[in-house]
Amino acid sequence: MAPPTGKRVKGVQIFRPFVYGTTARPFDEKTNPKPPGIPDDHTHSWTVFIKGIDDVDITYWLRRVQFKLHESIPNHVRMVEGVKGQPFQIHETGWGEFEITMKLYYVPESSEKPQTLYHHLRLHPFGRTEEEKEAMRLNGGEVISWVYEEQIFNEPYEPFYDILISGALPPSASTLKDGGGGGGSGAATPTSANTPGASSSKGGNKKGHERSHSRASVSTNKDGKNNNESKEEPFVIQKSEGGVLERSAMIPLVNRPGQPFSRETEQLEIQKLKEAKLKVDEMKKQMMEELEKKQKRLEALRAESAKAP
């Protein structure tokens, strides 16, 4: 159902990066002991999650997530409500791999329909080559299966658009802001051209801009009423350790422990694609040369056959 205004911001797309996947660890007496009460046949502990890039908050656009696990697991359909600054996640134990269904429910202001993601739980080392599998084995047995994704909001409704562009906040300020949906007291409202991750149909600026904001300091009594009026205390936006601002489409510049997705990762993937293209071009060249030799040989045989009595 559309918001009261019922109007969409035409010609605008806003995207927000996030990460989803699973992390699994085999039970081990020293590094990962099995908790009491866990069935004997369970060999691993694992976590399935959806979170923001560089662990920034995403509850301003994602309200809740429904995780559908294997039917053999008790309470296999679970709803996780968003908690500001924390990932949507479930911790479990088991012995087998299976496909997990994740249904994303957006904040009411978006009026967007739920979307579904699918992810295969990985308990054992995997990869395209034996070297990749061996690298996982050397990682203390921890098996990481994460996916980088971008949520695109096409022509969002005006109330939701205002939330999305309500200003990027440094991660340290997330606990200072009230509520998980709006921009907070004193938040600036830049245009889409100045908002990371906002673009028009003609193309937009995806770079972040530092802006001065203010936060309200309010004390309350037991009844929840204000004991004094809001006091504005200005602060300057700063980048997080990974170079990411909250409520933005930024991603880290370099990789860090526990944060494998960055511009550095992107460049490495681009380099792999370039190397693969060179290899394919070389294979294509060799194939064409072999084909040309075979064609000449075929023409020679046809000529000999024509001369034969």
UniProtKB/Swiss-Prot annotation:
Keyword DNA damage: yes
A Pfam family the protein falls into: YEATS
Keyword Phosphoprotein: no
UniProt-recorded Gene Ontology molecular function terms: histone binding
Main location: cytoplasm
Annotated Low complexity bias: 187-203
Record keywords: Activator, Chromatin regulator, Coiled coil, Cytoplasm, DNA damage, DNA repair, Nucleus, Transcription, Transcription regulation
InterPro entries in the record: YEAST_sf, YEATS, YEATS_dom
Coiled-coil regions, chain positions: 265-309
Entry remark concerning the domains of this protein: The coiled-coil domain is required for assembly into the NuA4 complex.
Family note: Belongs to the YAF9 family.
Name of this chain's protein: Protein AF-9 homolog
Organism in which the protein naturally occurs: Neurospora crassa (strain ATCC 24698 / 74-OR23-1A / CBS 708.71 / DSM 1257 / FGSC 987)
Gene that this sequence comes from: yaf9
